[in-house]
């Protein structure tokens, strides 16, 4: 058979092969052990040396042309198969995308950070303390000695075991222990707030066994109730972002302050206009507490206040039931995102 005809037949056969299997079968017709080109190569031994050299060169050129056609068809079939697979896996970019769930701060944590930001802006430090506290720091150091009737004002979660000094452990009932802890590590003037979790045996629409509180303390040589009123009123106006806030101090009793006062506030406008809302406890730090801080009560004086972060959050956002903050209902929480 003429070499040119063999090459032409091979190229045509390869081009007509619809799949790899057919192509491999056609390859065997031309390049296999009994293929047309292979038979021609076997016959070279019958030729004289000069003719063998010339004919061998021609057969090799023809073989290269056939192999090139084979390679080209293999690539074409592979490309077609890939395109078919890609078409089956195609993504419709016109479909709306799936939105990723964006997280947000819990409303109480928003309040926590806002309180810190406001008090930092007026020169207060921020401190943190242990939630498992000793009864000495939680009660005794704050002028509530053992068997003092003030200890019955709140039910306490006591913890099994005692500290290294043999003192009873408990879940702190307020953040006030940080008054003494911080003052023992820092010298006056002391301006600090201590936000944190606290625990009491109480649960209803306005109380939770675990709640967040922020303690405020300012100790120096000439601090008065006027400073307390100025600081706290300024805080409320910044926190609620309004100037129509009236503040009053009602006489009260706390063992760690003397005199003591409940702080109430009232909006002049809006749905709560004309209503006095209890917001915080406060007072002038008791001399016994100042003494337990390691300071001289004849020289130093100051004020303290304690505010519930959930209470502030409820008033800011108009939430009526405290328990909603702890149920983790996304329908509720997304309102504050």
UniProtKB/Swiss-Prot annotation:
| A GO cellular-component term linked to this record | cytoplasm
Query: InterPro entries recorded for this chain?
Result: aa-tRNA-synth_II (IPR006195), aa-tRNA-synth_II/BPL/LPL (IPR045864), Phe-tRNA-synth_IIc_asu (IPR004529), Phe-tRNA_ligase_II_N (IPR004188), Phe_tRNA_ligase_alpha1_bac (IPR022911), Phenylalanyl-tRNA_Synthase (IPR002319), tRNA-bd_arm (IPR010978)
Q: Which GO terms describe its molecular function?
A: ATP binding; magnesium ion binding; phenylalanine-tRNA ligase activity; tRNA binding
Task: Report the domain of life of the source organism.
Answer: Bacteria
| Names of required cofactors | Mg(2+)
- Pfam families to which the protein is assigned, alphabetical: Phe_tRNA-synt_N (PF02912), tRNA-synt_2d (PF01409)
- What EC number(s) does this enzyme carry? 6.1.1.20
Family the UniProt entry places it in: Belongs to the class-II aminoacyl-tRNA synthetase family. Phe-tRNA synthetase alpha subunit type 1 subfamily.
Subunit-structure text: Tetramer of two alpha and two beta subunits.
Q: Which NCBIfam families does its entry note?
A: pheS
What name does this protein carry?
Answer: Phenylalanine--tRNA ligase alpha subunit
| Organism (species) | Burkholderia vietnamiensis (strain G4 / LMG 22486) (Burkholderia cepacia (strain R1808))
- The gene name on file is pheS
